[in-house]
Swiss-Prot record:
Swiss-Prot/TrEMBL keywords: Aspartyl protease, Cell inner membrane, Cell membrane, Hydrolase, Membrane, Protease, Transmembrane, Transmembrane helix
NCBIfam families noted in UniProt: lspA (TIGR00077)
GO cellular component: plasma membrane
Major location (coarse): membrane
The protein's enzyme class: hydrolase
GO biological process: proteolysis
Pathway named in the protein's UniProt entry: Protein modification; lipoprotein biosynthesis (signal peptide cleavage)
Name recorded for this polypeptide: Lipoprotein signal peptidase
């Protein structure tokens, strides 16, 4: 059992746990200090806001009738499971892929917790250009998923030594 945690990609799972804790702590702070629908101006291009997203990225399917909550929850569980199995089969030294998978798992579980507990995801990071364009509000879990996805793509471009 210990070799599974130290000799495989699962040794990187600490990063998923860190992403989950950071995400949930940030969301809790936002929910306690900023009323829903309100925000705090931090810089001319960045606000902290308290908004809900019942859909996925960019509020995809947010207007659906509630079934999307369970669809996205199921996807998060399946994807996290598949990536955890891949990490268990990978050597610990495959650092970029294991790093990427851990970030995706952490982000997926962070948003899964919101969907199960609240019925929606709490978003709070709001970047904008003047008042002309607001990027969709997002959270720490979304950042972890996005960074993980970028690392997965980068890992695909890295030449691997042939198996002998």
């Amino acid at each position: 059992m210990m070799s599974l945690l130290t000799g495989t990609g699962l040794r990187w799972m600490w990063l998923a746990v860190f992403a989950i804790v950071l995400d949930q702590a940030a969301k809790l702070a936002i929910m306690q200090h900023i009323p829903y629908g309100h925000g705090v101006v931090i810089t001319p291009f960045f606000n902290l806001v308290h908004v809900y997203n019942t859909g996925a990225a960019f509020s995809f399917l947010a207007d659906a009738e509630g079934w999307q909550r369970w669809l996205f929850s199921g996807l998060a569980i399946v994807i996290s499971g598949v990536l955890a199995v891949a990490m268990a089969k990978a050597p610990a030294k495959c650092s970029l892929s294991n790093l990427a998978y851990s970030l995706v798992i952490g982000g997926a579980i962070g948003n899964l917790i919101d969907r199960v507990v609240y019925g929606h995801v709490v978003d709070f990071l709001d970047f904008h250009w003047q008042d002309l364009y607001h990027f969709a509000a997002f959270n720490v879990a979304d950042m972890a998923i996005s960074c993980g996805a970028v690392f997965i793509i980068l890992d695909g471009f890295i030449k691997k030594p042939a198996d002998k």
